């Protein structure tokens, strides 16, 4: 099942990333998908790399897009400062409500083993 989810998210990101890179004017050198327990995404600005949480595929499209743009903007602005907030507002005007929506979801589903 994880393989299927990964393929679905990869397919979606293959469409989202080029579109948003062009809009924002950034280029991500490398990106990947992995399971993360505490984050929806990460960005290594120096390496030009972003990682997105596999669990995103289970969330609404708007939330996936929000996290994708959020991480791409970290290629421009490392910190969550005023400039970063202004960029988020420029590209995703309703980002605050999407962030709240995403934070209402469980980050990941832990499998219970007996």
What does each model-found stretch correspond to?
Residues 71:
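Walker B catalytic acidic pair
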């Amino acid at each position: 099942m994880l393989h299927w989810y990964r393929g679905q998210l990869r397919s979606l990101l293959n469409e989202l990333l080029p579109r948003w890179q062009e809009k924002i004017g950034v280029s991500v050198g490398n990106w990947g998908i992995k399971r993360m327990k505490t984050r929806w995404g990460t960005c290594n600005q120096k390496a030009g790399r972003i990682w997105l949480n596999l669990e995103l595929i289970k969330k609404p499209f708007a939330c996936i897009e929000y996290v994708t743009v959020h991480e791409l903007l970290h290629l421009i602005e490392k910190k969550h400062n005023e400039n970063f907030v202004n960029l988020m507002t420029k590209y995703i005007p309703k980002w605050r409500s999407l962030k709240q929506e995403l934070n209402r979801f469980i980050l990941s589903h832990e499998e219970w083993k007996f």
